Regions:
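Long, low-complexity, compositionally biased intrinsically disordered regions
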Residues: 1-90
């Protein structure tokens, strides 16, 4: 899993996302089919959505300024850590 995530995120976003997850900043994680939504508490509360496709993440969105510029952010990484820590049918 780590090698896969290293292709999705830069190391700083991955490390910060892991820290957000470990500090319990991922809240209201929900699954509807292959779509996940969550709120991540950062400098503000950011909405994160991701679509899971067979064996990979299809698309990810976040309301933070960094993601709005087309980047994959620490909030997205935090949600992936949260998903991987739970038993979801994907």
């Amino acid at each position: 899993m780590a090698a896969f995530w290293n292709r999705l995120f830069d190391i700083q976003s991955l490390e910060h996302g892991r820290n957000y997850f470990l500090r319990g900043q991922v809240q209201n994680l929900r699954q509807e089919g292959m779509r996940f939504t969550a709120e991540v508490q950062g400098t503000a509360t950011y909405q994160v959505e991701l679509e899971w496709e067979p064996d990979c993440v299809g698309s990810m969105t976040c309301g933070c300024p960094y993601a709005q510029r087309g980047n994959r952010c620490k909030h997205m990484a935090a949600v992936l850590f949260a998903i991987s820590s739970r038993s979801f049918a994907i």
